[in-house]
Amino acid sequence: MDLTEGSALGVFSCQLCEVSSPYSFYGQKPPNTRAIVLLEECFGIKDPFSPEREKFLILGSKCSLCSKTVCVGTVRRSCDSQSEAKL
């Protein structure tokens, strides 16, 4: 994976499924984009499957309910398991 533009800031690691990947940006504004502002701060990388500079992939974010670092698609499972533990 070529991360020469905006080289890796660190390694994103999901606290639920343990998937990990280097990330090249964190925040609401992906680099090399003009009119894109994300609703939440998230970890992302330049899309390794696209030659276009503006394309990016979201890896995950901090869950707004439990504050765990989770990958895309696991937030509901994270919060459901936490609320089940409280019952």
From Swiss-Prot:
It comes from the Eukaryota. InterPro entries: CDPF1 (IPR042426), CDPF1_dom (IPR018785). Belongs to the CDPF1 family. This is Cysteine-rich DPF motif domain-containing protein 1. It comes from Danio rerio. The lineage of its organism: Eukaryota, Metazoa, Chordata, Craniata, Vertebrata.
